[in-house]
Amino acid sequence: MRRTFFTFLLFIISLSGGQFTYCFSQTSAWKKLDLDRKFEKLQKNYELDLLMEDSLYMSMPQEEWIAVNDRREKMLDIIKREDDKMLDEIVSYYKSGSNIQAYQYDTLLSKVSQFYRLTQDAFLTEHLISYALPFYEKTKDLEHLFQCEAVMGLALTQIAREGDTKEYFNALEYMNRATDYGYKHYMDFRYEDSYDYITRLYQELLHPRWLELRKQTITEVYDRYCELKDLDVWLNGNPQLTLNENIKKRTNTTYFDFEYNIVEYLMSDRSQNQSNPVIKLMTKFYKRHHELKVELQNITQTDDYSISKKAEVQYYKVLHYTGLNTPLQSFLSIDSIYQSLKCTDDIAPIMIDLIGFIKDASYYLDITEEFSEQEKEKYALSYLQDLKTYTKKARTVRRQSGLYDQLEAIVTDPHFYARFSGDDRNDLILNLIIKSDAEIYSHSMLVTWIGWNMMDVLITEKPALLAGLLGYNTQKQVLAHNDEFHEFFWNACVTHDLGLNRMSPTTNLHYRSLSSHECQLLRNHLPLGAATISIDTYHARFFDQVIGHHKWYNGKGFPDSFDNVNSQYRIINDLLAITDFLEGGADLPAEGVPADYDERLKILKEQAGTRFNPELVNMFFNHYGLLTRTRELCTKEKQQLRYEIYKEYFNENLSK
């Protein structure tokens, strides 16, 4: 009996020893992972990335700028390798999933959430949160599960905005589930972050573009409105609740934004908004906006003052919608508000609102009958000049959320661009969209300069390849109108990456490598750009180049929906594909374009007849002057050219 007991005791001790050893190894692995240090380093590297980009904005001599940029690019390579290694270690630890403790998942959630607020790196956030989500689902830790689903939904929504629209419906599932839980339990939240997330969820769920996409009923929309009202009253009327004032203020602002968005939503489609409940709801918000106008008329603080003016603008829109104002009355009122607000000393915080006011005023200007076309054009040109000023200022405001959406909305709004000729509309796209991002604009201009020489040789030596384009059917006509061919190709080169501007948060991401999903998503810049370039017949001429410049000579490549082989502009598309490839500065990571110029030349020669037009490749390699000049532009002169581009891009308004 004693022997049995002794043996059993030894067995227990051996098990305990093994357990202690295992616990020790787990603790050691956790300490080695050191999430605090890793995320602190990731944050510093991200900020260093931005800081080094910001240094490019400064006025400095050319040689100094080139030296700084060379150091920057080398530093970014080091940072990227360092961050990739740290992220691999984090993923490997949580991917194992064995005996990871609750507090370790809590730490991951906290660190990722903080990092997302700073960087808006949606892909990395979604990937890392996906390792914590199953744990909270299994353990029924509902508040942490709520936070996970909230962050996941917000990150997926951002991914959807960059072009992967199918992700929005995944995001919607997470956000609705989190919002439903948050509304039921917000009085019991233990963490301040949870209050921050619930307000952000309402803010996102009630954005007008998502209201329209989901085609919600008025009842569903109004139910969410009532929920937000309850939350706002409780957060701002509970003296025992000690919360960051910014969270309370955001909730109150979101409450206003919700009212604003609902009114915009109701006014967007007259045909569906004739029912009695809708009219009653419109009347309610009409009265509320009148009250808000009175309440906020004496506010002078910039952000609140902008809110009051936004409410007042919508008030005049509602007056017209309900038949109480003529288009002229609403236009004059909105224009007056806009003119007073644009004189604000610091317009950066209200730039998005100002662009929105121009869009609203342009609508009433277009439909009013009291003004002559000359008077309308005078207002429109004034607005255009203001927009150019705002976009210049925006170049020094890094990644202002929503700015690109607002610029794209006004550029593609027929009530705004109807006043302008083809050249003016081209100016709109160049200054308001293409110039909204420095790196993409720099790449487009480099492609343009390389392409100009390519087109010059093509016209001179092989004009027959261009016969039949632009209405000129003979070689003689092509030679006689070479300026038109140059201009056409110049516009095609400038606009070819138009769709990348929406994706600039991803294309400008240098502190880590892109995932395969991100590389795949970047291909969406082709249909996105094609949709924007199709705003009118003038720009639609460049549709084939915008959507087809990654299509191969043999018909392969992407997108599948575009048939390059049968395109009437095939020779232009083929020439642009070669020019874009040789520049190589902003090509898609998934395409594996080598950084070394000689390596690119090797690929160009090897893939003639499959990826590249063999006749154009032969023309390029057999023309010594073109070959030499292109090498200069792509190598030793490239940094000098980039300096000139950045100088024009940023410094034109630094002295103002």
Regions found by a protein language model. Give the residues of each.
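Flexible helix-coil transition and linker loops at the boundaries of alpha-helical arrays
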Residues: K85-A102, A132-L145, T179-Y191, Y225-R250, ...
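Classical Sec-dependent N-terminal signal peptides that target proteins to the secretory pathway
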Residues: M1-Q26
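An active-site-proximal "capping" alpha-helix that borders the catalytic cofactor pocket
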Residues: L446-D456, L521-S534, D596-F612
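Short coil/turn connectors between adjacent alpha-helices in alpha-solenoid helical repeat scaffolds
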Residues: Y57-I79, V112-T125, L156-L172, Y202-D223, ...
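Histidine/acidic-rich helix-loop-helix segments that form or flank divalent-metal centers
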Residues: I247-R250, A467-C493, I533-A577, E591-A595, ...
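N-terminal leader/linker segments that initiate helical-solenoid repeat arrays
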Residues: C23-S110
